Curated annotation (Swiss-Prot):
Organism: Borrelia hermsii (strain HS1 / DAH)
Membership in a protein family: Belongs to the universal ribosomal protein uL14 family.
Taxonomy, superkingdom: Bacteria
CDD domains in the cross-refs: Ribosomal_uL14
Protein name: Large ribosomal subunit protein uL14
GO molecular function: large ribosomal subunit rRNA binding; structural constituent of ribosome
Annotated Gene Ontology cellular component terms: cytosolic large ribosomal subunit
Length: 122
């Protein structure tokens, strides 16, 4: 579960390294974001000479969470970190690569481009 002020690793090659959640989108009272939810992030650390700069504000989709995800078949999946992929205005990934595994729940949230870029889907 990701809430406001949560730090996430950026799991793509846009140049951002660490981002901070500043808003969870999807209703005025929505407090937590799970895998597949869209959030607004501020980039806190970035690689020099990259398209994403420190201080930039972007939309992002959550691809991994430390809090376990319960699936319909009763199994639970959790990851070592909280991670996101930065999106453009059309909610497509800005980067061309996605690092690390992503959760299968992104398919249900219609982020097929993020799933196809990922090296592993769990």
């Amino acid at each position: 579960m990701v809430q406001i002020q949560t730090y996430l690793t950026v799991a793509d090659n846009t140049g951002g390294k660490i981002a901070q959640c500043i808003k969870v989108l999807g209703g005025s009272k929505k407090r937590y974001a799970r895998v597949g939810d869209i959030i607004v992030v501020a980039v806190k650390q970035a690689i020099p000479n990259s398209p994403v700069k420190k201080g930039d504000v972007h939309k992002a989709v959550v691809v991994r969470t430390s809090k376990e995800i319960r699936r319909k078949n009763g199994t639970y999946v959790r990851f070592d970190d909280n991670a996101c992929v930065i999106l453009d205005a059309n909610l497509n990934p800005r980067g061309k690569r996605v690092f690390g595994p992503v959760a299968r729940e992104l398919r249900d949230a219609n982020f097929m481009k993020v799933v196809s870029l990922a090296s592993e889907v769990i």
